C-alpha cells in the first residue's frame, strides 16, 4: 500500500505516475520488481487496447478486425487484473517480512513461524506467476495484430510486446527468488513451468518484433 504526502494510504494503481515512480525509487521494500512487472503489463495492455480501437473503428483495416477483437477480449480481462496484481504483489511481500518477525522462542513459536514463512513465500511466488501467465496471454495475440491491425499504430504493438515480455520475464524472476527458499516439493507446478514460459516468451516476442519490423518497412 502506498502512502501519499500527508499520510493518505492508497493503492499503487490509484497513484499518479509521479507518485508511483517516487515510491518505486524509495528505499522502502515495496513496491518492488513484482509490482513493477504487473504495472508494465498494465501499460502493455493499455497500448494494445489503443491499437485495437484504432483498428476496429476504421474500415480501412477491416482485415485486422478479427485479430483486434481477439486482442481486445484478452485486454478486457487484463485491464483491471494487472492493477490488482501490482497491489497483491506488494502485500504478499509485506506478509513475508511480517512472518520473519514472528517470535521464535518456544518450539511451538518456531514451528508456527516456519509454517507461516513458507505459506507467505509460496503466496509471494504465486502472485507474479499469475502476472507471467497473463503476460503470455497478451503476447500471444500481438503478432496477428501487428500483421493485420492499423498500420499507423504497428510501432505501438511493438512497444506493447516489449513491455509484456519484460513483465513476463521480470515476474518469473520474482517467482524464482521466492521458491528458492522453499522445499523442492513446494510449488511444483510453478517450478516445472518457469523455463517453458520463459522460452515461449522469447520465441513469441521475437515473432512479434519481426512482424512489427516487416510492417514498418514494407
Model-derived features with residue positions:
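Preference for long, well-ordered alpha-helical segments
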Residues: 138-141, 153-212, 218
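Short, Lys/Arg-enriched N-terminal segments with co-localized hydrophobic residues
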Residues: 1-9
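Conserved phosphate/anionic-ligand binding catalytic regions in large, soluble enzymes, centered on
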Residues: 26-49, 152-171
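Amphipathic alpha-helical interface segments
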Residues: 89, 93-162, 166
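A structural-propensity feature for long, helix-poor, extended segments
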Residues: 59-97
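Polytopic transmembrane helical bundles with strong interfacial aromatic enrichment
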Residues: 12-15, 130, 177-180
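Amphipathic alpha-helical coiled-coil segments
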Residues: 71, 75-82, 128, 135, ...
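Short, hydrophobic/aliphatic alpha-helical segments
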Residues: 12-30, 151
